[in-house]
C-alpha cells in the first residue's frame, strides 16, 4: 500500500514538472495568464489526475474561469504530449482545478495582522491609563 502511494506521488510530481513546461511552451493562447501548477493528485489506478493551478495577478473570477476553460479545452492535447514525454502505460485524464489556498492564505495573513495591530492598540491604551 505504501509503495502504491509513493508511485502515484512520484507520477504526480513528474506530471507537475512536465505540465509546467508544456503549458509554457505549447499553449499559445494569448488570453492565458501566467499559470502556476501548485500540485497534481493522481488517482490510485492512474486513470485521473487533478491538476491544481493558480494564475498570477488574477483575482477576477471571470478571468480565472477563462483560464480554466482554456486549460480544460487543451487537456486532451496536453495529455497526448505527456504521453510522449513520460513513460507510462496509460496517461491519466487531466482535470484542472483552481487552487484557492494562496488567496485564502493571504486573507488569513491579513486577518492575523489586523488582529495583532488591534491588540497592540488596546494594550497600548491600557498602559497609558495606568
Swiss-Prot record:
Function: One of several proteins that assist in the late maturation steps of the functional core of the 30S ribosomal subunit. Associates with free 30S ribosomal subunits (but not with 30S subunits that are part of 70S ribosomes or polysomes). Required for efficient processing of 16S rRNA. May interact with the 5'-terminal helix region of 16S rRNA.
Keywords annotated in UniProt: Cytoplasm, Ribosome biogenesis
Species the sequence originates in: Pseudomonas aeruginosa (strain LESB58)
Protein name: Ribosome-binding factor A
Entries under Pfam families matching the protein: RBFA
NCBIfam families noted in UniProt: rbfA
One biological process term in Gene Ontology: maturation of SSU-rRNA
Self-association state and partner proteins as the record states: Monomer. Binds 30S ribosomal subunits, but not 50S ribosomal subunits or 70S ribosomes.
Protein family: Belongs to the RbfA family.
Localization annotation: Cytoplasm
GO molecular function: ribosomal small subunit binding
Record-level GO cellular component terms: cytosol
